[in-house]
């Protein structure tokens, strides 16, 4: 019985490792913070991590600890609990242009034709790479704080709609919706 329990534990940890291996994580920012105490300053670290499966799921997390590896581990765990799904067109770009904001940071994301690549700065690039977007043009205006930029990017991605969901909301066919799209052809497959 004990041997079965032990073996089951190993299998569960192996399953967890396989599930974790499907995610790609990017360290966006590390910040050294100090707490002033009676004896001087006590230093710690805060980490911002973005993870994704490069197939449309992405999340971000923030972790704080006295040591850098522990802060990164906490941030990664928080990111896994904060995963969201984003509908991608052809598995490589956004369905439409979108804007997002958080605090004083604003971001504008534009769908791009194949071969454009990721044209985005800093923290936004990490989000797109882990999400699996290959072609996008992004611009950030206002705050360049990495936390605000990541949260503004997630705010924008939260509002991305696939043609299928828009058609369902409007009670029309997907082909009708795509035929109306400027410069689009009606043969594009909706996700």
Curated annotation (Swiss-Prot):
One of its GO terms (molecular function) is structural constituent of ribosome. SUPFAM superfamilies: dsRNA-binding domain-like, Ribosomal protein S5 domain 2-like. Residues 1-20 are annotated as: Disordered. Belongs to the universal ribosomal protein uS5 family. Part of the 30S ribosomal subunit. Contacts proteins S4 and S8. This is Small ribosomal subunit protein uS5. PROSITE patterns: RIBOSOMAL_S5 (PS00585), S5_DSRBD (PS50881). Residues 23-86 form the S5 DRBM domain. It comes from Rhodopseudomonas palustris (strain HaA2). Keywords: Ribonucleoprotein, Ribosomal protein, RNA-binding, rRNA-binding. One of its GO terms (biological process) is translation. InterPro entries: Ribosomal_Su5_D2-typ_SF, Ribosomal_uS5, Ribosomal_uS5_bac-type, Ribosomal_uS5_C, Ribosomal_uS5_N, Ribosomal_uS5_N_CS, Ribsml_uS5_D2-typ_fold_subgr. It comes from the Bacteria. GO terms for cellular component: small ribosomal subunit. The N-terminal domain interacts with the head of the 30S subunit; the C-terminal domain interacts with the body and contacts protein S4. The interaction surface between S4 and S5 is involved in control of translational fidelity. PANTHER family: MITOCHONDRIAL RIBOSOMAL PROTEIN S5. With S4 and S12 plays an important role in translational accuracy.
